[in-house]
Amino acid sequence: MRKILKLKIGRDELVFETGFMAKQANGSVLATYGGSSVLATVCCSNNVREDLDFVPLSVEYNEKYYAAGKIPGGFIKREGKPKDKEILVSRLIDRPMRPLFDKRFGREIQVIPTTLATDQLNPPDIVGMNAAFTAVFLSDIPFNGPIAAVRMVYLNGKFIVNPSFEEIHDSDLDIVVAGSLNGITMVEGGANEVSEDILLSAIDSAHEYIKQICNAQKEFLDIVGEKEKLPLAFEEKIFEFKEELRDFIYADLKEACFVKGKLNRDKAITLLRNKSYEHFSSLEKLDDSNESLFYKAFDDFEKEIVRNSILNDKIRTDGRTPNEIRDILAEVDILSRTHGSSLFTRGETQALAVTTLGTSIDEQIMDDIDGDKRLNFMLHYNFPPFSVGETGRLMTGRREIGHGHLAQRALESMIPGKNDFPYTIRVVSEILESNGSSSMATVCAGSMSLMSAGVPVKRQVAGIAMGLISEGDKYVVLSDILGEEDHLGDMDFKVAGTENGITGFQMDIKIENVTKQLMRDALEQARVGRIHILSIMNSVISNSRVGISKYAPKIIQLQIDIDKISLVIGSTGKTVKAITDEFEVKVQIEQNGKIILFGDDDFKMQKAKEKIESIVREPKVGEIYEGTVKKINSFGAFIELTPTKEGFLSTRLKSRDSKYGSGRFGHGNRYSRFGSGGDNIRGNAGLVRPPKLEEGQRIKVRIVDIDKFGKIDLEIVRDKDY
């Protein structure tokens, strides 16, 4: 039976419906906000696996073109592989939800939110998140919900919940916040150099709306009726010889955890793990039935040692104090033929960033249900397996897309507008080494690479990854975390920004008791670390290069009247194609009359500009043109001044001392065909005729008269006349 629940959030009602669509799924909910609707389903496998030590969850958010009344572009008229946007939204749904599933469930879980309608006003991603969370909460799958999500923006000094696309575009802060009744679990977004206080206030405001949605989900569960939960696949077991294992390894493991260098530390721990395995196997206390429990117990001891050292002794595995940042080395211009490059090394994490400048033809075209877009700034993040000393496939996964998007958002508020810098900008980050915080190393390397390329960015942007170790009311905030601290810690949050404020933010919280004061302390510690990193980056390069690389395409811009655009294009594009071929340039013509020329040769580009200016320029008496003889008849020749203008050169005899503007004489009214003789005819001294002309010949002429109908009369210009 169809069940409906409504609540007011922001400008519109958020509507949940269930019991009438996708009824064979373990859970299904249709969520609608304004005119945007998303159907979310959740299903689990019937196969139970007891050997899983993780949650086998997959989230596949997808958008249908029919939702916006569109048919997919391109040759194939069917939705294809997931777009980057769909992958990013899938990650937004996955991250806050994954920790709330019980690992003992032992079955694969798949959540599929599908956008069925969009009103082009309300972004469907937030609708999809709440549809997915509610579908799982109402299902028979064990889940520690409810959770909910909202988007908050800061616009004109006010916070707006679930804003429109236009409000998002105009805002200074745009974040997506997910959480439960007890606290925040995830935050992600970008900003235009906002303060830490504004970010905290936005998160606080978001949590109030999140609690409303969570309470509505509980009310909806009462209306629908709670399903009997599926049983857990296994009870949590512990290694029965755990205390013996502690006695055997603890002292050696404590020493191994603090070996300097990631590879050396991993090697020492692995040797000790293998030694322990062989020891307990020889005692016949280890077999296939408890092997996984042995490894879990070993990992628990490692986690206990590291966390206790940080909480009690304030010493991390690499010897640093909690707020200490690893050694940093920054370089620029390390690649000779690229348009801009930088190498940023922080401890054992290293990012090589390369900036390439292109033309508007190189823009990324986004065929999206929210409307077609053209992106002139892109950042691509690559994480090859050698960066962690491993082998593997070279491919772009969801993690790479997510990290690249975070770094791109952190930098894009510093990118100049198209009017100021009409280039397409692509930054590629190659992670050459990784031991934590590679996405923030990408921000730092990318910022310096942009300056190296001569992109007039406003300021340097630096990023830092922060962590948290807590126990009860006791906590320690960590600056510039290692990979293992990310894994063993209670919170992972990344902050990017300038010396003036925050530009990018991502946070995932694994515990519920994160207080506002804790977050304030963490953000302040991140700010101090960010300023330190910026000081090192600015000592290497603090301002963008003056001018771009000689290997980058050159650009010239000019503005013409809108009604002259057709003159530049010409019939069936004939004129603009001729300019392109003659001067070896690319010509972009915009609807507002702006013309952008792209090319590699400054001289040819300048000539192309002059050509266009001559095409759109209104002719004036006295101006000199180098024209082409198009046609000759008995009375004179038609001279093409520009592809859109012609003048007439009469065969009438001209006076040597005539002045342009008179055009005709009262005497010497004699005509002759071209090529009939010399300059002087029958003693008429001072009278001249044009030299012999041929069609296609180039000749310098001066405008001597323009009548009221626009007819242009010309005279020949000799070298001694100008």
Curated annotation (Swiss-Prot):
GO BP term (any one): RNA processing
Membrane-crossing segments per the record: none
GO molecular function, one term: RNA binding
PROSITE patterns reported in the protein's UniProt record: KH_TYPE_1, S1
Pfam families, per the entry: KH_1 (PF00013), PNPase (PF03726), RNase_PH (PF01138), RNase_PH_C (PF03725), S1 (PF00575)
Enzyme class of the recorded protein, top EC level: transferase
Domain S1 motif: 622-717
Binding site for Mg(2+): D486, D492
GO cellular component: cytosol
Every KH domain range: 553-612
Protein name: Polyribonucleotide nucleotidyltransferase
Gene field: pnp
